[in-house]
Amino acid sequence: IEKFISDDTVCIDTGMKKERQRAEMAFEYAEKGNTVCVVSSGDAGIYGMAPLIYEMKREKESKVEIVSIPGISAFQKAASLLGAPMGHDFCVISMSDLMTPWHVIEKRIVAAAEADFITAVYNPKSNGRYWQLYRLKELFLKYRSEDNIVGYVRQAGREEQSVKITTLKDFNPEDIDMFTVVIIGNSQSYNWNGSFI
């Protein structure tokens, strides 16, 4: 986004896992009367910075005005590259257990699989977290056919982008990394000429 920002704009990049620090700095600048934009990839309200900003405003009892602008979430970008997989009821589940304990995530996975939701999976894997994706596959296979369609997109919209459509049976968690969005179809989903519908 640098090309859209004027040269005299102060830009602060804190990187991952410093979201709270970034939000604190945003409030410091805003409370001094500056106009501040907190940039979050995808849609700021979906696993992004917006919830933290609102939470911090409440904690600080701040009078700073917040305007949230919607974006395109990673699952939407991935879906468009796969075809049209989100055409019916769906849910989005993050596999990250940093803020949600695994037993809660597992309950959500079971509920999604049993209720036949199309399911987008965020944060499927990280350096220290890999077995959960195998467990997700195992849980979905309890409630779905092994021929259930699964699609995944790695590095959506970037140069290294890759797109794959497979089945639940053939889905290999080893092909997935932290930059991948996985979409598991429902019982009506199908692969038509390489498009996930």
Model-derived regions: residue spans:
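A contiguous loop/helix-start segment that scaffolds small-molecule binding in enzyme catalytic cores
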Residues: 35-36, 114-197
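Generic secondary-structure signature for well-ordered alpha-helical cores
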Residues: 6, 28-32, 58, 80-87, ...
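Short acidic loop-to-helix transition motifs that present clustered carboxylates
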Residues: 18-22, 74, 98, 157-158
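Conserved beta-strand scaffold positions in the cores of enzyme catalytic domains, especially
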Residues: 11-13, 66-68, 92, 150-152
